[in-house]
From Swiss-Prot:
It comes from Treponema pallidum (strain Nichols). InterPro entries: HPr(Ser)_kin/Pase, Hpr_kin/Pase_C, Hpr_kin/Pase_Hpr_N, P-loop_NTPase, Ser_kin/Pase_Hpr-like_N_sf. Residues 264-269 are annotated as: Important for the catalytic mechanism of dephosphorylation. This is HPr kinase/phosphorylase. Mg(2+) binds at S159, E202. GO terms for molecular function: ATP binding; magnesium ion binding; phosphorelay sensor kinase activity; protein serine/threonine kinase activity; protein serine/threonine/tyrosine kinase activity. Keywords: ATP-binding, Kinase, Magnesium, Metal-binding, Multifunctional enzyme, Nucleotide-binding, Serine/threonine-protein kinase, Transferase.
């Protein structure tokens, strides 16, 4: 629990009332558990590695057990290595419960949030923490709201392209090394690997520059969902590049498919403008409009019309 960011702690509004020595207990599973069955004495398949969430129902049953002097289930529950217990709705557990929990060093936490809201927020936080992660070389920028991961060989111009995009009002997320996490199984969230050196760029011939200081806080983002990958490569005259845009390429990162665009680089090509156009075109696709397919259908329709009119005219017809 100590590893939570300050923002995440504030969103959960947690307050420790007992078991402070156990705040460093490891949390190894992102799921939650409602301990109703455990309190009733059923200890088969105990999900003891999960965070134990006590709502109003569990609290009412807990009070009934304590009033009847039935401490057995509670004492046995604390023989397991529980990461922590959280009481929602601002409920403060009875002193007897805190006394039974103290020897196990299980933190007892209280939050003002409802059980449903706490579950949603906890799952969001834990999903981010336990998300599979990979680090890739590239530059992550936000262009017209679209997260673009610029990749390519060293020296192809990734940082220079990103710098021009920042100059044009877009935002930098990470340069050189991007940490990518798969959240909820289908979203790729990218960020800088090291916060202390984040939002710095290395420009050959110029050195290290601080984007925040040069362009202001409006030119950066802490994290962004990756919605497109742009592969910059040296122009290869023997390679056939897509000129219509009807061929949709994809790449896979952490088992998530992402649209891929291959852009050949050579003198005279304005790569930043091409990336801006690619970002706007991607937004159109997400809105249901595919420019290349619309153009292709228009051409086919025109060809069909010409083919239908052809039998009615002869080459020597004059008007």
């Amino acid at each position: 629990m100590l590893k939570l960011d300050l923002k995440e702690r504030d969103s959960l509004d947690l307050r420790c009332i007992a078991g402070h020595h156990g705040l460093a207990n490891p949390i190894t599973i992102s799921d939650l558990n409602r301990p109703g069955l455990v309190l009733s004495g059923f200890f088969d398949f105990v999900a003891y590695r999960r965070i134990q969430l006590f709502g109003r129902g569990e609290h009412a049953y807990l009070l009934a057990l304590l009033e009847q002097g039935r401490y057995g289930a509670i004492e046995k529950m604390f023989t397991f290595d529980l990461p922590c217990c959280i009481f929602s709705h601002g409920i403060t557990p009875p002193e007897k419960f805190l006394h039974l929990a103290e020897p196990s060093s299980c933190p007892i936490l209280v939050t003002r949030l409802t059980s449903s809201e706490l579950s949603l927020r906890l799952m969001r936080v834990l999903s981010n923490i336990f998300a599979p992660t990979i680090a890739l070389h590239g530059v992550l920028v936000e262009v017209y709201g679209v997260g673009i991961l610029i990749s390519g060989d060293s020296g192809v111009g990734k940082s220079e392209t990103a710098l021009e995009l920042i100059e044009r009002g877009h935002r930098l997320v990470a340069d050189d090394l991007v940490e990518i996490s798969c959240v909820n199984g289908n979203s790729l969230i990218g960020r800088g690997v090291h916060k202390s050196i984040g939002h710095h760029m290395e420009i050959r011939g110029l050195g290290i520059i601080n984007i925040t200081q040069l362009y202001g806080v409006g030119s950066i983002r802490e994290r962004k969902e990756i919605q497109m990958v742009v592969q910059l490569e040296e122009w290869n005259s023997s390679k056939a590049y897509d000129r219509l845009g009807t061929q949709e390429l994809n790449t896979t990162i952490l088992d998530v498919s992402v649209p891929l665009i291959e852009i050949p680089v050579r003198p005279g090509r304005n790569i930043p403008i091409i990336l801006e156009t690619a970002a706007m075109n991607e937004r159109l696709k997400r809105m249901g409009y595919f420019s290349a397919k619309e153009f292709n259908q228009s051409v086919l329709k025109l060809m069909e019309q010409n083919a239908a009119h052809a039998p009615y005219y002869r080459p020597d017809d004059t008007y």
